[in-house]
């Protein structure tokens, strides 16, 4: 029991430090390349912080533990919105830019609906997994192409000399890659220790997947989102959550199902966990709408904001959800 406890403590310390450096690197690369921090938050940060979910779910599928794989993916989505965005908003209200409301959040809602439809038969087969991966490739490709077209349409030209004074690409790449590597390694150590402790206490696989593993593999999102919000990089914090949930719903489940088709899983995943995930995704859109919010962007459009009250609401939902899971398991 001592070794798992040490892994949890060291993993958490390294996780917090590496997340801060990872955000610095991501923002630096985004600015150097002229990309928006929203896009790099969805693609690079979203992928990097979802790497633990991918590894855990793939291994779970190969070890014939579909409940752990699905619990990890969908539990992480629930934790990302209710716990991580909730905590981030309580610490520092999160700005929701117009692009996220018009394009990215509707896509996330559509992807969530697709995941529910594919799971209605109580199985996620290899074809379902391939469909999810193809949709994932399409969504990421569309976002990247849209960003490139928008840059050209606006006639935006980056002054490389001025940009290099503001940020060093080499240094940013170093922090980005080093931070990413340490994020993955520390989260793996943290999850391993937490799972070892939980199993020593006799907790079920599904409960582990939905709670400890889901929260553990979502800690990179928590650390990087808080770090981004405290640095004033709201696009990165919000894009991180959207990107991570897209990765989890499409890539994580898709990879797991393609490697080892899930012929069956507990009915509670479909009747309890996926509806909670869907409701939270819709609330994310509703809370982000710029209704009665006076912030204006450079284009004269109102900006949405997830404030501390809404963040507290998310946290309350998560506490209630976890309490319900524990009550059912007892």
Descriptions of predicted regions:
Residues 1-330:
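Hydrophobic alpha-helical segments, chiefly the membrane-spanning helices
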């Amino acid at each position: 029991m001592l070794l798992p406890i040490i892994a949890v403590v060291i993993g958490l310390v390294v996780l917090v430090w590496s997340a801060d450096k990872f955000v610095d690197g991501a923002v630096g690369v985004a600015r150097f390349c002229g990309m928006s921090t929203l896009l790099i938050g969805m693609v690079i940060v979203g992928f990097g912080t979802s790497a633990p979910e991918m590894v855990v779910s793939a291994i779970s599928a190969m070890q014939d533990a579909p409940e752990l794989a699905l619990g990890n993916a969908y539990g992480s989505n629930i934790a990302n919105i209710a716990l991580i965005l909730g905590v981030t908003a309580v610490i520092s209200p999160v700005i929701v830019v117009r692009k996220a409301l018009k394009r990215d959040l509707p896509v996330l809602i559509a992807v969530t609906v697709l995941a529910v439809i594919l799971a209605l038969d109580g199985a996620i087969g290899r074809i379902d997994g391939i469909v999810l991966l193809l949709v994932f490739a399409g969504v990421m490709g569309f976002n990247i192409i849209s960003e490139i077209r928008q840059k050209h349409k606006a006639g935006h030209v980056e002054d490389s000399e001025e940009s290099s004074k503001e940020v060093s690409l080499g240094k940013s790449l170093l922090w980005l890659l080093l931070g990413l590597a340490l994020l993955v390694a520390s989260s793996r150590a943290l999850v391993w220790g937490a799972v070892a402790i939980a199993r020593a206490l006799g907790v079920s696989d599904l409960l582990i997947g939905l709670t400890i593993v889901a929260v553990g593999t979502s800690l990179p999102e928590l650390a990087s989102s808080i770090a981004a919000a405290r640095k004033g990089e709201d696009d990165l914090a919000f894009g991180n959550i959207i990107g991570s949930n897209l990765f989890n719903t499409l890539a994580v489940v898709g990879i797991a199902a393609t490697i080892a088709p899930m012929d069956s899983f507990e009915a509670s995943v479909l009747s309890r966990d996926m509806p909670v995930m869907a409701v939270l995704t819709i609330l994310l859109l509703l809370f982000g709408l710029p209704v009665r919010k006076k912030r204006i962007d450079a284009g004269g459009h109102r900006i949405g904001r997830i404030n501390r009250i809404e963040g507290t609401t998310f946290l309350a939902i998560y506490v209630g959800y976890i309490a319900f899971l524990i009550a059912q398991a007892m």
